[in-house]
Amino acid sequence: MNEKILLQAEKEFDIRFSEVDSMQIVWHGSYALYFEDAREEFGRKFHLEYMRMYEFGFYAPLVEFKVNYKQPLKYQDKAKIVITFRNTESAKLIFDYEIYNTKTNVLCATGHTVQVFLDTNYQLLWTLPPFIREWKKMNGLPE
């Protein structure tokens, strides 16, 4: 039986005044913060927090960020972001995102990010760090 294991987390949030532009729709730069909040929620849920990586001697900088806007979110809307880990053999963390308006359940944005691993000397890793191999194993993912 070869079931695909899906690691997902979600977080609900309110659209704040500081996140919108003069048209009162979410400013494009706010999506980077939403994605970051989702990664932190994922880290808490699946024990892959940034400080844990740091304690193992690694950094995971963002090298790719993409967002596709489908429908606008507006000031005072309530939204939900769903983050999904995309397993890869590469020494990367890849996440997909979906943002929904919780009142209408309309998909408002999708996106993805890619992070790589650096050691404490800021050298790029070409293979998975041992702690990520162990983390994948703990969560039933193939290396």
Model-found features: residue ranges?
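Catalytic strand-loop segment that frames the active site of acyl-thioester-processing enzymes
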Residues: M1-K45
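HotDog/MaoC-like acyl-thioester-processing domains
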Residues: N2-K11, K74-Y75, F85-E143
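Generic structural detector for well-ordered beta-strands
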Residues: E12-R16, N68, V116
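Short, well-ordered turn and helix-capping elements at secondary-structure junctions
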Residues: F17-E19, K66-Q71, K103
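A broad, structural micro-motif
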Residues: V26, A60-L62, C108
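Hydrophobic beta-strand-centered segment that forms part of the acyl-chain substrate-binding groove
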Residues: F42-L93
